[in-house]
Amino acid sequence: MSASPAPTPEGADQAGPLYLTWDDIGLATTELAQQTLAAGVPQAVVGIVRGGLIPAVWIAHRLGVHDVRTIEVTRTTSDAVNAAKTPLPTVRNPASIGNLTGLDVLLVDDIAGSGTTLAHTAQMVRDLGPARVRTAVLAVNRANWPAGSEPHDRIDHIARLTTTWVVFPWEEQHDQL
């Protein structure tokens, strides 16, 4: 994976969920855009539905990219904190992503726990024939990360590392503060 500046460690030792604010998201998407820009502007930004949509659009705006696409991949069985996961990610309507042949693509999600959803989706995108696929996430939850590997071994751009559940400002639980 590409070398990126060290992600910010906020929330690394926090007890309970980490509630990110819209300001946090603005800073994180700016950081991810800067990391991405260091290796060149992508031709398309693909957001993983649902959580990756908002950061994908913000990053695309910061990079001046107009080609923003989506791919619906699910693994978490509900929106509850520490919700159960299915063994493998499920892709719904894979044709919705369109033709990526020869494009430089940035694939964006909000969170990587084990990294399985992002890795599975990145491989599916690579199978569509783009020239390059880079990955970016707002946060990595190291509490769920596989032992013996580092997030930067599998993810190109990371804004934040934590060891707790992350609640984003667009999620229902966020308003229950």
Regions found by a protein language model. Give the residues of each.
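PRPP-dependent phosphoribosyltransferase catalytic core
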Residues: 2-12, 123-177
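Short, glycine/charge-rich flexible loops or terminal/linker lids adjacent to PRPP-binding catalytic cores
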Residues: 29, 65-105, 116-120
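Glycine-rich phosphate-binding loop signature in dinucleotide/nucleotide-binding domains
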Residues: 36-41, 98-101, 128-129
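Substrate-recognition/cap helix-loop segment adjacent to the acidic, metal-dependent catalytic center
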Residues: 56-67
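Active-site-facing substrate-recognition patch
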Residues: 1-41
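Structural beta-sheet core signal
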Residues: 70, 107, 135-137
